């Protein structure tokens, strides 16, 4: 929005021309989202306490989690608000990719909000009925995918980038829709499953979003795209602003969510952030890179799938409890140790993912 204002004001003061640079707006978006999150955080937490929007805890979970019961949840609303305001202020709103990203963010956020609200009003951990939850997640995902498919300016927009192989980029055609569906829905659920400990999901989210900011910038720059042998997606560099807004909002939320947490993001935050990462990965054609950099999310989701599958087939559990972070808790790891080690792993995976861009 401020891009348009700067275009007018530059006639009178050339310093406003700085706002036309994507790097400047990306930094400002990060700082804006961070400051908004820090500013409204105490107010949101107090309001959630007044409304008695407290966390419900599973009876079969680790005993250390019983003390978390009643901690304000649905704090993801402050994340969404911070990202939304920051993006609307600093992004070029004439860019359709920005609206696709915001659509998924708030679409999944709305689904998560309803899910959280049902848990709170029913005083248990059962939210939306699974089939309805997946139905609405699928609707949002498919609308966004078809929107992106329609926006595709050239064949590169539907190519599949395979790490380590610069000359292998198959054209997906309509399979692009199928792959993209699983990426968005899968990432939304994976981040949701990861959000079980204080700060566990939000830091990897910030790291992955920061990495995708760099990738989106390179993808939208014809020279860097050619240098890295990745598809050049026209206008995709504007998504950098959205990604850095996620980073800023995530860091601001972490201020209140770090152990011991003052607030939880709830499904309204985790589903929204997961969906946002998924749609950005599709937009910049780096689905495989999302699997690498978001490895913590992938492992958390796989642990649940393996646990459920093993119990149904063999009546035996692989882990003491799934998602896998609970397994380590039941083995005696203190919660902060699990969190910090997962953060370290996430940082290493993000760096590995970025390195693969050059090792091709």
UniProtKB/Swiss-Prot annotation:
CDD domains attached to this UniProt entry: GT_MraY
Alphabetized PROSITE patterns for the sequence: MRAY_1 (PS01347), MRAY_2 (PS01348)
GO MF annotation terms: metal ion binding; phospho-N-acetylmuramoyl-pentapeptide-transferase activity; UDP-N-acetylmuramoyl-L-alanyl-D-glutamyl-meso-2,6-diaminopimelyl-D-alanyl-D-alanine:undecaprenyl-phosphate transferase activity
Localisation: Cell inner membrane
Pfam families listed in its UniProt record: Glycos_transf_4, MraY_sig1
One GO term (biological process): cell wall organization
Transmembrane segments: 21-41, 73-93, 94-114, 132-152, 168-188, 199-219, 239-259, 263-283, 288-308, 338-358
Keywords: Cell cycle, Cell division, Cell inner membrane, Cell membrane, Cell shape, Cell wall biogenesis/degradation, Magnesium, Membrane, Metal-binding, Peptidoglycan synthesis, Transferase, Transmembrane, Transmembrane helix
Enzyme kind, highest EC tier: transferase
One GO CC annotation: plasma membrane
EC code(s) of this entry: 2.7.8.13
Entries under InterPro entries matching the protein: Glycosyl_transferase_4, PNAcMuramoyl-5peptid_Trfase, PNAcMuramoyl-5peptid_Trfase_CS
Reaction equation(s) it catalyzes: UDP-N-acetyl-alpha-D-muramoyl-L-alanyl-gamma-D-glutamyl-meso-2,6-diaminopimeloyl-D-alanyl-D-alanine + di-trans,octa-cis-undecaprenyl phosphate = di-trans,octa-cis-undecaprenyl diphospho-N-acetyl-alpha-D-muramoyl-L-alanyl-D-glutamyl-meso-2,6-diaminopimeloyl-D-alanyl-D-alanine + UMP
Entry membrane topology: Multi-pass membrane protein
Cofactor: Mg(2+)
The protein's annotated pathway: Cell wall biogenesis; peptidoglycan biosynthesis
UniProt xrefs under PANTHER family: PHOSPHO-N-ACETYLMURAMOYL-PENTAPEPTIDE-TRANSFERASE, PHOSPHO-N-ACETYLMURAMOYL-PENTAPEPTIDE-TRANSFERASE HOMOLOG
NCBIfam families associated with the record: mraY (TIGR00445)
Function: Catalyzes the initial step of the lipid cycle reactions in the biosynthesis of the cell wall peptidoglycan: transfers peptidoglycan precursor phospho-MurNAc-pentapeptide from UDP-MurNAc-pentapeptide onto the lipid carrier undecaprenyl phosphate, yielding undecaprenyl-pyrophosphoryl-MurNAc-pentapeptide, known as lipid I.
HAMAP family membership: MraY (MF_00038)
Family recorded in the similarity comment: Belongs to the glycosyltransferase 4 family. MraY subfamily.
Identification of the protein by name: Phospho-N-acetylmuramoyl-pentapeptide-transferase
């Amino acid at each position: 929005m401020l891009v348009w204002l700067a275009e007018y004001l530059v006639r009178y003061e050339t310093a406003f021309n700085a706002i036309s640079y994507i790097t400047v707006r990306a930094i400002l978006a990060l700082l804006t989202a961070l400051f908004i999150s820090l500013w409204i955080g105490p107010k949101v937490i107090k309001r959630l306490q007044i409304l008695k929007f407290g966390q419900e805890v599973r009876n079969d979970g680790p005993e250390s989690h019983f003390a978390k019961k009643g901690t304000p949840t649905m704090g993801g609303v402050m994340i969404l608000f911070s990202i939304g305001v920051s993006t609307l202020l600093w992004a070029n709103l004439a860019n359709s990719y920005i609206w696709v990203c915001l659509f998924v963010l708030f679409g999944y956020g709305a689904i998560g909000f309803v899910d959280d609200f049902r848990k709170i009003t029913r005083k248990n951990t059962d939210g939306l009925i699974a089939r309805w939850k997946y139905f609405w997640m699928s609707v949002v995902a498919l609308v966004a995918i078809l929107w992106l498919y329609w926006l595709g300016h050239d064949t590169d927009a539907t190519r599949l980038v395979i790490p380590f192989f610069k000359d292998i980029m198959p054209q997906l055609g309509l399979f692009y829709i199928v792959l993209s569906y699983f990426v968005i829905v899968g990432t939304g659920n994976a981040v949701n499953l990861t959000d079980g400990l204080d700060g566990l999901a939000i830091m990897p989210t910030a790291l992955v979003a920061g990495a995708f900011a760099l990738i989106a910038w390179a993808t939208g720059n014809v020279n860097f795209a050619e240098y890295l042998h990745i598809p050049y997606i026209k206008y995709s560099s504007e998504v950098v602003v959205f990604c850095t807004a996620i980073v800023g909002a995530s860091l601001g939320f972490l201020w209140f969510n770090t152990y011991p947490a003052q607030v939880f993001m709830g499904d309204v935050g985790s589903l929204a952030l997961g969906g946002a990462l998924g749609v950005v990965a599709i937009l910049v054609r780096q689905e495989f890179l999302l699997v690498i950099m978001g490895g913590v999310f992938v492992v958390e989701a796989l642990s649940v799938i393996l646990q459920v599958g093993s119990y149904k087939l063999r009546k035996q559990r692989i882990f003491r409890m799934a998602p896998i972070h609970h397994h380590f808790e039941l083995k005696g790891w203190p919660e902060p140790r699990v969190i910090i080690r997962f953060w370290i792993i996430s940082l290493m995976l993000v760096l590995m993912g970025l390195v693969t861009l050059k090792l091709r």
